[in-house]
Amino acid sequence: MIKSELVQRIAEHNPHLYQRDVENIVNAILEEIVSALARGDRVELRGFGAFSVKHRPARAGRNPRTGEHVPVEQKSVPFFKTGKEMRERLNRDGLDGATPPSPPAA
């Protein structure tokens, strides 16, 4: 699902809202999440999950073509941890309502 499909589905479930208003709301929510992460804050949506920033230290990398060692600078990356309710629902219902795959036999 892409953002425009999300906006369309929300608008369909809320006929009292114009699609452009739903789009503005979705954009505002996403912008607030990004702004909070940029400030170093954690964003927790109970039952859904939590967004945070992980800091990766500088390290030595390798160019796969030449094998040359290259320095890789430290960086910050977004991280999402699913909430308990979401994990339970996905494991219970599976994807698209299908039965989740069984674990491999030991």
Curated annotation (Swiss-Prot):
Gene Ontology terms, MF aspect: DNA binding; structural constituent of chromatin
GO CC term (a single one): cytosol
Superkingdom of origin organism: Bacteria
PROSITE patterns xrefs: HISTONE_LIKE
InterPro entries linked to this entry: Hist_DNA-bd (IPR000119), Histone-like_DNA-bd_CS (IPR020816), IHF-like_DNA-bd_dom_sf (IPR010992), IHF_beta (IPR005685)
SMART domains documented for this protein: BHL
Biased composition (Basic and acidic residues): 82-95
GO biological-process terms attached to the record: DNA recombination; regulation of DNA-templated transcription; regulation of translation
The entry's keywords: DNA recombination, DNA-binding, Transcription, Transcription regulation, Translation regulation
Stretches for region Disordered: 57-106
Function statement: This protein is one of the two subunits of integration host factor, a specific DNA-binding protein that functions in genetic recombination as well as in transcriptional and translational control.
UniProt cross-references to HAMAP family, sorted A to Z: IHF_beta
Family of this protein: Belongs to the bacterial histone-like protein family.
PANTHER family membership: DNA-BINDING PROTEIN HU, INTEGRATION HOST FACTOR SUBUNIT BETA
Complexes and interactors: Heterodimer of an alpha and a beta chain.
Protein's name according to its UniProt entry: Integration host factor subunit beta
Gene symbol of the encoding locus: ihfB
